[in-house]
Regions:
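Residues that flank catalytic or metal-binding motifs in active/ligand-binding sites
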Residues: 66, 76, 104, 138-140, ...
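Short hydrophobic-aromatic micro-motifs
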Residues: 29-30, 144, 190-192
Length: 275
């Protein structure tokens, strides 16, 4: 399945605004990054994949068994390989996280009917770190809206400026702050600073709310998923350099004893093309 629509060309002014928002309030919404038709294609593929995994006893279910997560999307469809390297997404994260940005995870998040709130939290690697967190940008989350995100169907909510606290929220603390609810038409993206306090709100509708979560790191931060193994060496042969970079296949590991550099493969390490 391919996305047929052309991606938006992002201006330097819009990049400036996105970066400013991520560093100040902690989030930025970019509407209509892909068309509604392409969002429908991705939604259909996501729901079909989730159903297959459920039948096979795979995937992850939480939130009173009403929220479903599908992991390792890059390995599960061409459409996901396209979305993870969307030019608008890459332009924003290169600006925020550096030219050598890598992917940490790419997953599906399906908030089913009557699902509860997801609970206030921060994203990896911050939840694996002891506060206070270092200042600056380590990671960012990309929330692909494959449905219209409305106030009632489980949208993402953020506490503006909370990333500046440099720590996770204490129990009951986030509720004392004014939250911002991310609503936008399908095909849009919510970009968030990885340290911001956020959660999905309850879905009080009768339809599932489908989104994709793409997390991107500075290259010095170890990814949450084992991204280099999501595609085989053969599958990667004709893929873009950008996808190879995102999967960590272009990172070099120095072997000083032998005077060579290693790179990750699907099964381990190799010196192929490493200089």
């Amino acid at each position: 399945m391919n996305l047929e629509s052309s991606n938006l060309k992002i201006s330097s002014e819009r990049l400036d605004l996105a970066e400013k928002d991520l560093r100040t309030v902690g989030f930025h919404i970019f509407e209509n990054v892909i068309t509604a038709e392409d969002a429908d294609k991705a939604r259909e593929a996501t729901l079909a994949l989730a159903e297959t995994e459920a039948q096979n006893g795979k995937g992850s279910i939480y939130g009173e068994d009403k929220i479903r997560r599908v992991w390792a999307l890059v390995s599960k469809g061409t459409i996901f390989c396209q979305l993870i390297q969307n030019p608008t997404v890459i332009a924003i994260w290169k600006r925020f996280l550096g030219e050598d940005v890598i992917a940490s995870t790419f997953t599906a998040n399906i908030v089913g009917p009557d699902a509860p709130a997801g609970g206030w939290h921060i994203d990896y690697p911050y939840w694996a770190m002891s506060p206070p967190f270092p200042e600056g940008s380590l990671t960012g989350q990309t929330v692909w809206m494959l449905d219209d995100f409305t106030p009632d169907n489980g949208p993402t909510a953020c506490i503006p400026n909370s990333h500046k606290m440099l720590r996770p929220p204490k129990p009951g603390e986030a509720e004392k702050h004014q939250m911002a609810v991310a609503t936008a038409p399908k095909g849009s993206i919510l970009f968030t600073n990885g340290a911001i306090w956020h959660q999905c709100l309850p879905n009080t509708t009768k339809q599932p709310r489908v989104g994709l979560l793409g997390m991107y790191n500075r290259s010095v931060i170890y990814p949450q998923e084992d991204m280099p193994r999501q595609l085989t060496d053969q599958q990667l042969e004709n893929q873009s350099d950008m996808l190879k970079q995102l999967l960590g296949r272009k990172m070099q590991f120095r072997d000083p004893e032998n005077g060579i550099n290693w790179r990750r493969t699907e099964t381990g390490f190799d010196t192929h093309d490493a200089t």
